[in-house]
Amino acid sequence: MRILVDSNRYQDFCEGEPQAVHVIRRAAEIMIPFIVLGELRAGFACGRRSYKNEQTLTRFLNSPRVKQLFADEDTTHQYARLFRQLRKQGTPIPTNDLWIAALALQHDLLLFTRDNHFDHLPQLPVI
């Protein structure tokens, strides 16, 4: 199983939430997009345990199963298609999450998230 981990599920994993731990341990390949890294680090910067959180993230990123995922030109086309679809449906989602969805679809990944607004994208497999 190849997954893209959203920030809320990464946090769940770090807190030992059983489903998050199970899914992440079972995954053959774990993608973490640059947007999620930005969200996490923004949270770290505002918190009291930024150094500890950064160390934990670094250990996670150093796992051979974890790869960082970046946007490219194909991602921008996927983003535009999704933006149009959601606008037409009248169901916009936050910009960061739209980028996350575009990356997951582009790379044929299961999105591991707790955010239910991704349900507005039936073509996006979510766990």
Regions found by a protein language model. Give the residues of each.
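Conserved beta-strand segments of alpha/beta enzyme cores
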Residues: 29, 65-67, 125
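Acidic, PIN/NYN-like endoribonuclease modules and their adjacent C-terminal/linker elements
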Residues: 1, 101, 105-127
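Generic structural signal for small/hydrophobic residues in well-ordered secondary structure
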Residues: 6-7, 40, 79, 104
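Short, well-structured N-terminal submotif of metal-dependent ribonuclease cores
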Residues: 1-35, 45-59
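Histidine- and aromatic-rich ligand-binding microenvironments
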Residues: 6, 32-33, 92-94, 115
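Active-site neighborhoods of divalent-metal-dependent phosphate/nucleic-acid chemistry enzymes
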Residues: 67-112
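A generic structural signal for short hydrophobic patches within well-formed alpha-helices
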Residues: 10, 37-40, 118
